[in-house]
């Protein structure tokens, strides 16, 4: 009647339009029921043939194809292109259907996009529903009935889904077997191809890449990214595989992480097994089959391990030769690179640092921390090396401890031997080759003067203290900057030997430095008989700890009947407090006296050996008196 700018071509085309504008109808019966709907395009036999608005409405519907949108009544803003495209839609809006038979069952579903022959063909909402489904490709989402918010792109992608929601499938035949699984993401040719949940299940699977997760059936919570990543998993759960062929042999295991090309490639466990392996890096953990609880990070790290457990590996080529060794820790490039146990073994080896423990083959229970530490060890056991190059030449020796850069750096036993050397401090024992049972503590300990090389059972304690010969035995040197006096001796000093004690069990006296060339202001002492006569020698027993004054915290222990010092027998000696009083009353002794001293906690102490000069002086005085008396007696006779 009053409609304007309508183009109507074909028998009965737009024959009911009254006051509607800007419509195009081309084809027999197209737009034939419309009265007041405007701005529609209907091209094809009976296209939009039932559209009809009882009030003036801008429909913005477009239907192109035989019977396209033929059932639309009051739906708006639909784009329907293709024979039978959305031909049953009635009061639905904002749909796009392009391709033969697309969206051809739905009646009241809105906001769907179906592009490709038979895409979303079976979708059908009988109540008004915003489906928000997107299907692009031949048969994409072809079986979806009432599922919502699915995005399916690719030929036959998601084509078996029915009442499933929130899935994303991109790639030919991706997610194409599942019916009721929701919240899956499959990107790539046949990604998640076999997944199929027959009851409503939130799978939370993600597969991205050619045939990624292609065999997953009912496994859930898997993240598989990369060509053929996790492609054998069927019922496995909560796995992460990122990289070409990552975790590609796994079937039923759960909770593994494989990141990197071929990481954990051959791992395979039956349903319900929790291997909890982590492989990160090119070929990381490549050969693991049934090993569990391994953490492997780095290119080729742990790539020969098979049925080994509880290993920690960080670094390129770290632990890269071992097959059956378990409970190793290798952190650093090439750490424990050549370790290899061909039978199941708990190695308990720890190597941290560049090339640390590089050459270990079958040695066990070694702790090697520091670049190049213990890097020549092969089958040595129970060694500890901490510091750059520590124990760096040893091959087969056992039970050495080297702490500090270059400590025991040239020690090397070519046969199995308990070396039992301990070196702590920068370069301590750095010259020892085959010496055993030495203890060297302090920077450069064992290197002063003549280097200790093949000696045994020596103790050097202090900076730059040493022994008297390369093959020294049973020498003790404590102090700094000097060498011990000889075998079976203990020497103490700072810069030179101040005291040497024999250690061979014979009646050997203490020897202290007394060279006149070291002394000045020499004078004859007058401290003698008078001082000695004022001393009171006593006998005594040590108190039990409970009886000591409680403020003497080094010795007091409530309720303890243990003697505070020594045994409970009678001893001979002095009381320090009385000796201090005598010293203070003798000016000839008071200056320079080192007989009496006081500990920081207030405990008074005596150095009994320092009475000797006074005793000698007293004897000299008595001897002089005796000589005088004998001379007098002789004159009287």
Language-model region placement:
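Glycine- and small/polar-enriched repetitive beta-structure motifs of secreted/surface proteins
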Residues: 1-512
């Amino acid at each position: 009647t009053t409609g304007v700018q309508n183009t109507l071509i074909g028998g009965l085309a737009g024959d009911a339009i009254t006051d509607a504008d800007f419509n195009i109808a081309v084809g027999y019966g197209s737009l034939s029921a419309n009265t007041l709907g405007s701005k529609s395009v209907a091209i094809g036999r009976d296209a939009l043939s039932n559209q009809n608005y009882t009030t003036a409405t801008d429909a913005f519907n477009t239907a192109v194809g035989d019977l396209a949108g033929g059932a639309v009544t009051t739906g708006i803003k639909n784009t329907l292109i293709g024979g039978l495209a959305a031909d049953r839609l009635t009061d639905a809006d904002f749909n796009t259907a392009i391709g033969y038979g697309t969206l051809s069952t739905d009646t009241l579903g809105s906001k769907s996009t179906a592009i490709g022959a038979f895409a979303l063909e079976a979708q059908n909402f009988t109540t008004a529903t915003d489906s928000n489904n997107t299907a692009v490709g031949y048969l994409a989402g072809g079986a979806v009935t009432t599922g919502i918010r699915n995005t399916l792109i690719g030929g036959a992608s998601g084509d078996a889904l029915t009442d499933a929601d929130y899935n994303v499938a991109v790639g030919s035949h991706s997610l194409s077997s599942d019916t009721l699984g929701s919240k899956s993401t499959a990107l790539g040719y046949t990604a998640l191809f076999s997944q199929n949940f027959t009851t409503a299940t939130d799978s939370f699977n993600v597969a991205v890449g050619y045939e990624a997760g292609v065999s997953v059936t009912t496994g859930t919570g898997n993240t598989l990214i990369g060509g053929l990543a996790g492609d054998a998993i069927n019922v496995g759960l909560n796995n992460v595989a990122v990289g070409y062929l990552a975790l590609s042999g796994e079937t039923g295991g759960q909770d593994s992480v494989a990141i990197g090309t071929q990481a954990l490639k051959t791992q395979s466990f039956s349903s319900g097994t929790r291997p909890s392996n982590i492989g990160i890096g090119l070929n990381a953990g490549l050969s693991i089959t049934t090993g569990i609880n391994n953490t492997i990070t780095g290119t080729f790290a742990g790539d020969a391990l098979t049925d080994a457990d509880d290993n920690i590996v960080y670094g390129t080529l770290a632990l890269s030769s071992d097959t059956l060794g378990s409970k190793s820790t290798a952190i650093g490039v090439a750490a424990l690179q050549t370790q290899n146990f061909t039978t199941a073994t708990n190695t308990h080896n720890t190597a941290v640092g560049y090339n640390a423990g590089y050459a270990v083959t079958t040695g066990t229970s070694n702790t090697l921390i520091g670049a190049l530490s213990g890097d020549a060890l092969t089958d040595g056991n129970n060694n500890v090396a901490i510091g750059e190059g520590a124990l760096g030449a040893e091959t087969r020796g056992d039970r050495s401890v080297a702490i500090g850069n270059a400590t025991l750096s040239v020690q090397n036993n070519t046969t199995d031997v308990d070396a039992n050397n301990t070196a702590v401090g920068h370069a301590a024992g750095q010259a020892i080759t085959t010496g055993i049972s030495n203890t060297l503590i302090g920077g450069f300990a064992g290197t002063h003067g003549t280097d200790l090389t093949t000696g045994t059972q020596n103790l050097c304690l202090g900076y730059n203290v040493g022994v008297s010969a390369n093959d020294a035995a049973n020498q003790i040197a404590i102090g700094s900057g000097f060498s011990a006096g000889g075998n079976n001796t203990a020497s103490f000093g700072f810069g030179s030997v101040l005291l040497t004690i024999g250690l061979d069990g014979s009646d050997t006296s203490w020897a202290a430095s007394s060279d006149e060339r070291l002394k000045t202001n020499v004078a004859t002492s007058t401290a003698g008989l008078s001082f000695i006569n004022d001393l009171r020698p006593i006998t005594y027993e040590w108190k039990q700890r409970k009886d000591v004054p409680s403020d003497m915290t080094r010795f007091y222990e409530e309720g303890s009947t243990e003697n505070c010092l020594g045994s409970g027998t009678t001893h001979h000696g002095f009381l320090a407090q009385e000796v201090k009083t005598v010293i203070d009353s003798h000016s000839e002794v008071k200056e320079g006296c080192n007989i009496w001293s006081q500990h920081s906690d207030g405990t008074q102490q005596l150095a009994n050996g320092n009475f000797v000069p006074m005793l000698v002086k007293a004897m000299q005085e008595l001897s002089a008196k005796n000589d005088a008396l004998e001379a007098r007696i002789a004159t009287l006779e």
